[in-house]
């Protein structure tokens, strides 16, 4: 985690080593300290398979619910044979998963319902002109009041992080342009800024 003081702009990083429990890897969730960690921890789980203990919604965020494996792990099978595009509808679930360790150190799952019986749910997207991109939001409303929003991301995710591992820096620039057609230059500028900072390059 990278934490920043919004007044002084001081930054500090907090690193946590994942603990292995059987064949799974776990770290404590910080969602109760910082609510912004919600989607970030789900993204780590989706791509790397690390379960965040105490997070109330450890579902996939970018990949399909029936996707097998964790694509940013070094041992992930990248062969086309193991990653055929499914031709079936994506299975839906009305439950979330929360993982914790019991008194004997075993990983146990607790399930929570997404919606109450009297909830009114509006599916916003995945194709809607106001989103300016492919995005689905399961929106729980009470009259004109939005009670909760469950985002479904990744409809145009291409695994660019994995592709960039075998590219030179100049080769990656064309990929960042395709992240979002509305702000292609912003993504390229962000990547170039990180590369320059890592190389110690000062612009004049």
Question: What function would you assign to each model-found segment?
Answer:
Residues 1-119, 125-130, 134:
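Conserved helix-adjacent loop modules within structured domains
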Residues 124-204:
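Active-site- and interface-proximal helix/loop "cap" or "latch" segments in soluble metabolic
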């Amino acid at each position: 985690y990278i934490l920043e003081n919004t007044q002084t702009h001081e930054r500090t990083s907090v690193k946590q080593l994942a603990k292995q429990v059987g064949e799974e890897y776990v770290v404590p969730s910080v969602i109760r300290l910082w609510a912004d960690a919600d989607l970030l921890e789900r993204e780590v789980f989706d791509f790397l398979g690390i379960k965040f203990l105490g997070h109330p919604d450890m579902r996939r965020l970018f990949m399909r619910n029936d996707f097998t494996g964790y694509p940013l792990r070094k041992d992930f099978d990248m062969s086309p044979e193991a990653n055929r595009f499914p031709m079936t509808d994506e299975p839906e679930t009305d439950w979330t998963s929360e993982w914790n360790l019991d008194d004997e150190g075993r990983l146990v799952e607790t399930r929570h319902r997404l919606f109450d019986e009297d909830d009114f749910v509006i599916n916003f997207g995945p194709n809607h002109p106001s989103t300016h991109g492919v995005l689905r939001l399961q929106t729980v409303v009470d009259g004109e009041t939005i009670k909760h929003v469950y985002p479904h991301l990744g409809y145009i995710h291409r695994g660019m992080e994995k592709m960039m591992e075998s590219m030179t820096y100049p080769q990656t620039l064309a990929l960042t342009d395709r992240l979002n057609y509305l702000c292609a230059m912003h993504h390229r500028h962000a990547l170039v800024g990180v590369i320059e900072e890592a190389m110690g390059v000062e612009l004049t």
